């Protein structure tokens, strides 16, 4: 993600593709999409809050859904291989 995109609060994705294999980025996208957000950028635009992350892995620890309930995630991988192809990767 480019720095200019992070500064633009109204950035819209230009394209979307599906993840082919698991990575740390795919893991975090999976967590955001489970909570009802496109990605970290959309979460920051809507909630305007810091994202809690696990210090050792860097994975998302806690997200607030749009209905104000919370999702708590484990320190370890949660996106199983059979779920990887469902994760959407957006390009800006």
From Swiss-Prot:
GO terms for cellular component: nucleus. Keywords: Differentiation, Spermatogenesis. GO terms for biological process: cell differentiation; spermatogenesis. InterPro entries: Meiosis-expressed_gene_1 (IPR020186). It comes from the Eukaryota. Essential for spermiogenesis. Belongs to the MEIG1 family. This is Meiosis expressed gene 1 protein homolog. The lineage of its organism: Eukaryota, Metazoa, Chordata, Craniata, Vertebrata. The gene is meig1.
């Amino acid at each position: 993600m480019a720095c200019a995109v992070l500064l633009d609060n109204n950035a819209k994705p230009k394209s979307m593709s599906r993840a082919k294999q698991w990575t740390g980025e795919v893991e975090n996208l999976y967590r955001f999409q489970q909570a009802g957000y496109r990605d970290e950028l959309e979460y920051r635009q809507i909630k305007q809050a810091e994202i809690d992350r696990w210090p050792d892995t860097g994975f998302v620890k806690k997200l607030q859904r749009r209905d104000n309930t919370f999702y708590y995630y484990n320190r370890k991988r949660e996106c199983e291989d059979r779920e990887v192809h469902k994760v959407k990767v957006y390009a800006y």
